[in-house]
């Protein structure tokens, strides 16, 4: 056993075992960095195994005003030592001054009530709590140990508790709950001002009352106060320099309450008046004739204005992932509001903030500090917008989670490359924007790009023309273009581009045909010539015909699977051997064939798939499905105006990413080919019409053509065939219309189509909490003591084997 800094009358005593050494050091640093607790004297008591607990050790506990017990596996193992537990029971009395911190120990692991009868009266904390929770629990324990609510309470304590609560020369204690009001709370420099302080507890006239003014850069000054009545104290404010000053009220040696007052000069007051008169929010409300002043109305107006002025093709091509991670101090600016994101965070413009986060440079602006060293998230919390602070933090964390998830899915075990980084950035930007704003035009284009590339060319040209010359909103695009894209997808037409089909019919080029210029005249004789015959393939070599191929079709596919390069559906093994590997350019946007969203789907894609299933089942026709999608899109745009709706979408996206990470071990490695209903070969069965289990139409059991098998040729069939073979995932839920943005139930079932096998349960992922909003945010949390399995009540220390700690967590 060892007690560091031993002395009588300590305020905080940290009781721990060697396996919680890092948590003890962390709490000491936390108490020193907090202005409200740093004045309290802190000691530590380290309990080592096989050590005795002497009377001197007992006095260390008795003189402490707060006993903070770090309950770890090693400490619980010491409870079985002979003669130690009774001494600890006496040391942890009275219970209101004891706080326990569970370090890898669960309340249900042991019957702690049998160890300590007052266990239920202890304050409890966990390793996942925020630093404010630790500070509040310690302050509460010290406050309750100070005596009682009123400083005039002089009733004698119970004689049984006297030996355990002996205190002399109590240091100041902060009790902010006793304060009601301070008038005035702003004091003019150089002017005599009387400050009135109203408290909740009764003050004793026989005890001297004083007020202590503590400036930040000068010594403290104590001024004698006057009791106006039992609850009111008046003091003459001393002449101090401008700035915030801490004010404490003492009744004898006991701190009754503490607050902060500010001193100001005449010039500072003039500046405050001018800044309040030129309030930008009130000015804009007046300019837009918003009477009475309403921040929510102004927020919607500015958000809609920004949406209408963004180019129709969107700004996501520029990216938003410019988060500065190195040399953060160089990003501090001299302005109070260096970016529009800081402005929106200060005045609580929530919808505008959500829209700005999807614009280029959003994360770069997030990493810029103003002249006071505050970032947009801390500015929002400072001005009372805690929900906005939480939204900004979760958005940035979700971007990082999503980018990491997509990059891992794209790499699929390959070495890291700049190409995957660029593809992950672009996919993350698009998916974040489409998830927070379901039904937007960017989502419509991206949804169609993967399924009907030929139909998206017209819309893409219109988007480029609108952004280059005459900027127009997405609603101004030609209605037939949008409708044709949606209709083609819902009908399940072939997704092969037209140029690919033309190459199949014209494999020999155009030089064999007469090229006619439409602008020039041509002779009638040339027009009346018979058409040129279709070129035939090369004649086979003379000799006997090749023997019939009796190898099953599916066997060929699996035989060629081992020869193909993993992850490339459209390049054969021959071309890989003959041609060198070509890596795409870093800034080249990924093609849709690579599934840039890594199996995840936007809300619009899921709604279109649901409607496509309904069309295939005959529930609705194509025209009705188009109308349903337009109605859903309009509804989503209206709901996107709500900040709460965007919060829910962000939460669903985070949960979806977490589920996919947990389900990844279940599916294992993704297979390269999607296996549909195999074709049976039989010499006795005639050719007949069959129906697959999940197919909506008949198919013929015929032998396939003898062509070179490629993975892409088998997998990338028409949307009607591929969707029919996989419609079992969504046919059940297709009867219901998806009415919200990121539906959690739908996302649960969106397992990649190629993943059909069932694997083991998901692996537990330990989430790291984020320390935010405290003056000690720079402190790194120590490693959590891992949880131990439930065991019987320990009798000897040999029965305890604490596991090693996990790596440190933190931002």
Curated annotation (Swiss-Prot):
It holds the Pfam family TIR_3. GO terms for molecular function: identical protein binding; phosphatidylinositol 3-kinase regulatory subunit binding. Residues 182-318 form the DBB domain. Residues 717-740 have a biased composition (Low complexity). The modification Phosphotyrosine is found at residues 264, 420, 445, 460, 513, 553, 570, 594, 694. Residues 146-169, 525-551, 702-811 are annotated as: Disordered. GO terms for cellular component: cytoplasm; cytosol; membrane; plasma membrane. Disruption phenotype: Mice lacking Pik3ap1 display altered B-cell maturation and impaired immune function. Pik3ap1 depletion has an opposite effect in NK cells by promoting their maturation. Mice lacking Pik3ap1 and Cd19 have severe defects in generation of immature and mature B-cells. Moreover, mice lacking Pik3ap1 display increased IL-10, Il-12 and TNF pro-inflammatory cytokine secretion upon activation of the Toll-like receptors TLR4, TLR7 and TLR9. It is found in: Cytoplasm; Cell membrane. It is a peripheral membrane protein. InterPro entries: B-cell_PI3K-Signaling_Adptrs, DBB_domain, PIK3AP1_TIR, TIR_dom, Toll_tir_struct_dom_sf. PROSITE patterns: DBB, TIR. Keywords: Cell membrane, Cytoplasm, Membrane, Phosphoprotein. Changing residue 264 to F: Fails to bind PIK3R1 in a BCR-signaling dependent manner. Loss of regulatory function in Toll-like receptor signaling probably due to loss of interaction with PIK3R1. Impairs mature B-cell generation. Gene3D superfamilies: Toll/interleukin-1 receptor homology (TIR) domain (3.40.50.10140). This is Phosphoinositide 3-kinase adapter protein 1. Residues 530-550, 801-811 have a biased composition (Pro residues). It comes from the Eukaryota. The modification Phosphoserine is found at residues 642, 718. Residues 8-146 form the TIR domain. Constitutively phosphorylated. Phosphorylated on tyrosine residues in C-terminal region by ABL1. Phosphorylated on tyrosine residues within the YXXM motifs by BTK and SYK. Isoform 1 and isoform 2 are phosphorylated on tyrosine residues, most likely within the YXXM motifs, via CD19 activation. Toll-like receptor activation induces appearance of a phosphorylated form associated with membranes. Changing residue 420 to F: Fails to bind PIK3R1 in a BCR-signaling dependent manner. Loss of regulatory function in Toll-like receptor signaling probably due to loss of interaction with PIK3R1. Impairs mature B-cell generation. Homooligomer. Interacts (phosphorylated on tyrosine residues within YXXM motifs) with PIK3R1 (via SH2 domain); required for BCR- and TLR-mediated activation of phosphoinositide 3-kinase. Interacts (via polyproline C-terminal region) with ABI1 (via SH3 domain); the interaction promotes phosphorylation of PIK3AP1 by ABL1. May interact with MYD88 and TIRAP. Residues 10-145 are annotated as: Necessary and sufficient to mediate inhibition of NF-kappa-B downstream of activated TLRs.
């Amino acid at each position: 056993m060892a007690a560091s800094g031993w002395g009588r009358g300590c305020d905080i005593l940290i009781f721990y075992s060697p396996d919680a050494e890092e948590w003890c050091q962390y709490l000491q640093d936390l108490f020193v960095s907090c202005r409200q607790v740093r004045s309290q004297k802190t000691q530590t008591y380290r309990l080592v195994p096989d050590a005795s607990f002497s009377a001197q050790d007992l006095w260390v506990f008795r003189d402490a005003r707060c006993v903070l017990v770090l309950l770890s596996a090693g400490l619980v193992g010491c409870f079985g030592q002979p003669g130690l537990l009774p001494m600890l029971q006496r040391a942890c009395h009275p219970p209101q001054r004891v706080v326990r911190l569970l370090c890898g120990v669960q309340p249900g692991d042991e019957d702690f009530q049998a160890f300590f009868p007052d266990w239920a009266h202890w304050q409890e904390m966990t390793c996942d709590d925020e630093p404010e929770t630790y500070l509040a629990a310690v302050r509460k324990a010290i406050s309750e140990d100070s005596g009682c609510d009123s400083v005039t309470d002089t009733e004698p304590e119970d004689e049984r508790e006297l030996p355990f609560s002996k205190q002399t020369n109590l240091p100041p204690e902060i009790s902010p709950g006793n304060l009601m009001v301070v008038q005035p709370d702003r004091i003019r420099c150089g002017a005599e001002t009387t400050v009135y302080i109203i408290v909740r507890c009764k003050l004793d006239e026989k005890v001297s009352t004083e007020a202590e003014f503590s400036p930040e850069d000068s010594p403290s000054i104590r001024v004698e106060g006057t009791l106006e009545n039992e609850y009111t104290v008046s003091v003459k404010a001393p002449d101090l320099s401008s700035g915030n000053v801490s004010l404490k009220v003492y009744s004898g040696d006991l701190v009754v309450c503490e607050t902060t007052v500010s001193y100001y000069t005449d010039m500072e007051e003039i500046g405050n008046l001018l800044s309040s008169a030129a309030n930008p929010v009130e000015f804009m409300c007046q300019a837009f004739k918003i009477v009475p002043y309403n921040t929510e109305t102004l927020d919607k107006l500015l958000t809609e204005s920004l949406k209408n002025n963004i180019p129709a093709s969107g700004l996501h091509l520029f990216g938003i992932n410019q988060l500065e991670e190195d040399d953060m101090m160089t990003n501090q600016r001299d302005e109070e509001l260096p970016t529009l994101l800081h402005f929106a965070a200060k005045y609580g413009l929530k919808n505008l903030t959500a829209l700005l986060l999807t614009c280029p440079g959003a994360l770069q602006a997030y990493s810029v500090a103003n002249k006071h060293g505050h970032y947009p998230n801390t500015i929002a919390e400072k001005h009372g917008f805690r929900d906005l602070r939480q939204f900004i933090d979760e958005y940035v964390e979700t971007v990082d989670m999503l980018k990491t998830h997509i990059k891992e899915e794209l790499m699929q075990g390959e070495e890291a490359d700049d190409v995957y980084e660029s593809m992950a950035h672009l996919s993350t930007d698009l998916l974040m924007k489409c998830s927070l704003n379901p039904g937007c035009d960017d989502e419509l284009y991206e949804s169609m790009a993967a399924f009907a590339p030929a139909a998206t060319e017209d819309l893409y040209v219109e988007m480029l023309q609108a952004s280059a010359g005459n900027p127009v909103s997405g609603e101004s695009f030609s209605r037939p273009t949008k409708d044709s894209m949606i209709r083609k997808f819902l009908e399940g037409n072939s997704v092969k581009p037209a140029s690919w089909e033309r190459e199949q019919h014209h494999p020999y080029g155009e030089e064999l045909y007469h090229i006619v210029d439409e602008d020039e005249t041509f002779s009638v004789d040339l027009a009346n010539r018979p058409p040129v015959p279709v070129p035939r393939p090369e004649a086979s070599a003379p000799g006997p015909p090749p023997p019939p191929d009796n190898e099953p079709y599916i066997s060929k596919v699996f035989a060629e699977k081992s020869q193909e390069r993993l992850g490339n559906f459209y390049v054969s093994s021959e071309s890989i051997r003959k041609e060198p590997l070509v890596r795409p350019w870093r800034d080249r946007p990924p093609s849709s064939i690579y599934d840039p969203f890594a199996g995840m789907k936007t809300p619009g894609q899921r709604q279109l798939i649901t409607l496509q299933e309904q069309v295939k089942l005959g529930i609705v026709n194509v025209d009705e499905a188009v109308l349903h999608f337009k109605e859903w899109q309009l509804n989503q745009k209206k709901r996107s105006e709500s900040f709460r709706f965007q919060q829910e979408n962000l939460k669903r996206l985070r949960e979806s990413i977490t589920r996919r990470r947990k389900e990844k071990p279940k599916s294992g490695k993704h297979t390269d080919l999607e296996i549909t209903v195999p074709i049976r070969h039989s010499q006795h069965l005639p050719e007949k019409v069959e129906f697959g289990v999940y197919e909506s139409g008949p198919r013929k059991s015929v032998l396939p053509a003898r062509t070179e098998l490629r993975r892409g040729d088998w997998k990338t069939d028409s949307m009607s065939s591929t969707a029919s073979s996989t419609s079992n995932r969504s046919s059940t839920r297709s009867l219901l219309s998806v009415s919200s943005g990121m539906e959690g139930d739908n996302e649960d079932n969106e397992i990649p189509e190629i993943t059909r096998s069932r694997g083991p349960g998901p692996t537990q992922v330990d989430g790291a909490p984020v320390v935010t909003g405290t003056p000690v945010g720079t402190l790194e949390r120590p490693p959590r003591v891992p949880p131990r399995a439930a065991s019987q009540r320990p009798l000897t220390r040999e029965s305890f084997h604490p596991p090693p700690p996990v790596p440190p967590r933190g931002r």
